[in-house]
Amino acid sequence: MLRHLLRHENNKVFVLILLYCVLVSILKLCTAQPDSSVAATDNDITHLGDDCQVTPVIHVLQYPGCVPKPIPSFACVGRCASYIQVSGSKIWQMERSCMCCQESGEREAAVSLFCPKVKPGERKFKKVLTKAPLECMCRPCTSIEESGIIPQEIAGYSDEGPLNNHFRRIALQ
């Protein structure tokens, strides 16, 4: 399969970036050590177990009528401490802290998708903008207004489309 991908000049850069992402992931796994620097006390449980990192992924860009294009990208993956406890000053109240692994800054890229089934006079390449996180960190989870959420069935993406298998994780064995 690698030989097939390397036949085309455009794919060589993609394969090199993909191999780089795999090597970075392997290095992260091999050099990862348990975090013994976190000393949890009864009053300090806010960062216990935080592990939020930028992770290489393959992002499949899709647009109706165009050939899907896998590109190397990044995503925020990990876990962040969340807790609920009795308030220290008001014992009849509870203190809550919900943290989520989220991006802190993002990068944007323009990618051209090949669209073979266009009408005469239309361009065969569609420019698509994509975003990826610059860095990741544990931040307070934000709520999303329900009115802004469109169910996949209504949007027409239940079986196919850009929301289905949007990111694929690189499998390391």
Curated annotation (Swiss-Prot):
Q: Name one GO molecular function term.
A: hormone activity
State its location(s).
Secreted
Disulfide bridge positions per record: C52-C101, C66-C115, C76-C136, C80-C138, C98-C141
Tissues expressing the protein: Expressed in one to two pairs of neurons in each of the thoracic and abdominal neuromeres of the larval CNS. Coexpressed with CCAP in most CCAP-specific neurons. Coexpressed with Pburs in four bilateral neurons in thoracic and abdominal neuromeres of the ventral nervous system.
Q: Does the keyword Signal apply?
A: yes
> What UniProt keywords apply to this chain's record, in alphabetical order?
Disulfide bond, Hormone, Secreted, Signal
- CTCK domain location: 52-142
Q: Which InterPro entries match?
A: Cys_knot_C, Cystine-knot_cytokine, DAN
Which region is the signal sequence? Answer: 1-32
One GO biological process this protein is involved in is:
border follicle cell delamination
- What is the top-level taxon of the source organism? Eukaryota
Say if the entry is tagged with keyword Secreted: yes
Quote the function comment for this protein: Final heterodimeric neurohormone released at the end of the molting cycle, involved in the sclerotization (tanning) of the insect cuticle, melanization and wing spreading. Heterodimer specifically activates the G protein-coupled receptor rk.
Q: How does it assemble?
A: Heterodimer of Burs and Pburs.
Descriptive protein name: Bursicon
Its encoding gene is what?
Burs
